[in-house]
Amino acid sequence: MKSFIKIHKQDNVLLALRDIQKGERLHAYGVSIEVKDDIKRGHKIALQSIKENDSIVKYGFPIGHASQDISIGEHIHVHNTKTNLSDIQLYSYTPRFDENPYSNENRTFKGFRRENGDAGVRNELWIVPTVGCVNGIAEKMLQRFVRETGDIAPFDNVLVLKHQYGCSQLGDDHENTKQILLNAIRHPNAGGVLVLGLGCENNELARMKEALQDVNLKRVKFLESQSVTDEMEAGVALLKEIHEAAKGDKREDIPLSELKIGLKCGGSDGFSGITANPLLGRFSDYLIAQGGSTVLTEVPEMFGAETILMQRAANEEVFHKIVDLINDFKQYFIKHDQPVYENPSPGNKAGGISTLEDKSLGCTQKAGISPVTDVLKYGEVLKTKGLTLLSAPGNDLIASSALAAAGCQIVLFTTGRGTPFGTFVPTVKVATNTELYEAKPHWIDFNAGLLAEDDVHEEYVLREFIHYMIEVASGQLVNHEKNDFKELAIFKSGVTL
């Protein structure tokens, strides 16, 4: 493995690719550097002397400024680096577009064609509770259905989309819960859904039913638990009816243009911005060249890199949507008396990320170079092809669930620290470093750490990843599916009664 890398020609820091000891001498870009401190892999080394208040540059952009004089060879991290971020900013539209290097290869995956024309990558039977009070009933109901049915084919799996909400909520929180659940019920990865209510909740089953008048009632059933004597018997009977209606479901060839892929990172480290996130960026550009769609979220992790995305707005209308996306989320922080730059997390810092700009510039690598074609509010579903931005926080569970609810059939999740989590659609874990991939083979699905190895070409790893993604879209299970780790989390910002 190489010892270090200079990511961009304008950078004044090196990134350590292995642990480097104090006193080691590095020969880097025409300069001989004696390392002044012990440097952990993923952390930064000063490539030149940096005066107090001067910019620290990584990825070709400032990630903050020096809080003290820094000598060549010194460790650059939170002890001598400060963010440049402020609160609300003014922006101007200065478009800049790069040519997508990929072309349409007319490839396909094996998926499920739905009656409304949508395409799913899984064929699952879901119970969607209108309120958290019936989570337990739903679990028992599904277990009994599986026990009595035996062979659940053609369903790949059965799942309860458990959540804690649906009652005691007001305003936006109530509407968000309702909309996320409605989106889940319509999701193309579900071949059938039982919508299970209690009977006294704010999120009334009758209102949900009104909003779903266009669904196939052989595939989507409704049950209010308080309105029947034996809710278990009634629920299992409805699940069996859905199962019977799905008997003819089978996979067929579907163009890659119909894939909608969410882009997410969590537990990021210093390698995220040079291995896994750029890999997702290249895959995003490749998929968009096939006519497909990708979605980037985690708005707080765009802070400090937002102008790059604004330059890529397809038109001025989209630019203003991005400005509103960023400033509205900053206002959310300000409203709650929180600094907009209170990020990265302790795990991020341990992995070498020093400021939010450092994290954000690495985070946005997942979006490649394609133009931004649309911006969605939380709870909205995809409307356009290409790269879309979605309003949601950085929290792994909430952001991944928001991507799935927006219509993404798969979520790609890069991580340098590791996580077992998955949302209610296939959540592919991509390791930023080989050490994590080898330590957690039951969590991690793909190793982007290869990109830090000597003589490993970007195009080779991309082609391996494309092949793997087509296999996943065609039914190959990822680790969180094998482990049955599937979660739904809904964003809450207001009062609970």
UniProtKB/Swiss-Prot annotation:
One of its GO terms (biological process) is D-galacturonate catabolic process. It catalyses: D-altronate = 2-dehydro-3-deoxy-D-gluconate + H2O. Pfam families: GD_AH_C, GD_AH_second, SAF. Induction: Induced by galacturonate, repressed by glucose. Coiled coil: none annotated. Belongs to the UxaA family. Last gene in the exu locus which is required for galacturonate utilization. This is Altronate dehydratase. It comes from Bacillus subtilis (strain 168). The lineage of its organism: Bacteria, Bacillati, Bacillota, Bacilli, Bacillales.
